[in-house]
């Protein structure tokens, strides 16, 4: 592993569930070292909305973020994209989130493409990579569940929703649909898994 390796843990809130056609509302990210200790200043961005896009009302109700708030606090989508690219493109960065492979990374790619930025280069160039903590959580449940309090739905099936797991494990996560709150919760879950796996290795 490179001596300057870092994770950049991030999350979007958006105005819809389809990364191909919907737009980002809010971006948050934090850089950590390999042990998930915070080493950089938090990044919080809002994206101004264009007049040719209609947000999904359901998304506004879930996140509480309105187009008016984004237009008041935000920056244009080209500038929004450039600032995200600057964070993602630092050498030896592993870009990570919770369910990011299936959603947030796709939101990034479509946003970059729309703004004439290579949508893939950030994830491989200069020793960079991407990773999804959700898949690690699922693997822990299947292979080494000790050390984590697991959450279950009413039908008895395991739930891997971040807000349910943080509640089950006493992790602060007051606003589950704020991007920065989700980033801090993801970091806390990553630390919990790392500590749990280390204690398992010590017992072997």
Descriptions of predicted regions:
Residues 5-6, 22-25, 31-33, 37-63, ...:
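Metal-dependent phosphoesterase core characteristic of DEDDh/y 3'-5' exonuclease domains
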Residues 9-11:
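Short hydrophobic beta-strand that contains or immediately precedes a catalytic carboxylate
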Residues 195-204:
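Residue-level detector of conserved catalytic or cofactor/ligand-binding positions
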Residues 13, 26, 202:
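Acidic-residue sensor for enzyme active/binding pockets
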Residues 63-80:
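Metal-dependent phosphoesterase signature
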Residues 13-20:
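Short acidic, Gly/Ser-rich segments with clustered Asp/Glu that frequently serve as metal-coordination loops
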Residues 2:
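Phosphate/dinucleotide-binding and metal-coordinating scaffold of catalytic cores
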Residues 77-90:
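Short, basic/hydrophobic alpha-helical segments
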């Amino acid at each position: 592993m490179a001596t300057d390796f870092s994770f950049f843990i991030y999350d979007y809130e958006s105005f819809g569930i389809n990364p191909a056609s919907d737009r980002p509302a809010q971006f948050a990210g934090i850089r950590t070292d390999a042990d998930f200790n915070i080493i950089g200043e938090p990044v919080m961005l809002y994206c101004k909305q264009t007049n040719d896009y209609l947000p999904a009302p359901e998304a506004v109700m879930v996140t509480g973020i309105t187009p008016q708030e984004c237009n008041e606090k935000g920056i244009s989508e080209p500038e929004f994209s450039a600032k995200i690219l600057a964070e993602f493109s630092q050498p030896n960065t592993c870009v990570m989130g919770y369910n990011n492979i299936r959603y947030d990374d796709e939101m990034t790619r479509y946003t970059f493409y729309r703004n004439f930025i290579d949508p893939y280069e950030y994830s491989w160039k200069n020793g960079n990579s991407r990773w999804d903590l959700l898949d690690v959580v699922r693997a822990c449940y299947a292979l080494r569940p000790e050390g984590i309090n697991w959450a279950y739905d009413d039908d008895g099936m395991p739930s891997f929703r971040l807000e349910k797991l943080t509640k089950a494990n006493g992790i602060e996560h007051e606003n589950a649909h704020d991007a920065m709150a989700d980033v801090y919760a993801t970091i806390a879950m990553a630390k919990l898994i790392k500590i749990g796996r280390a204690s398992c290795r010590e017992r072997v």
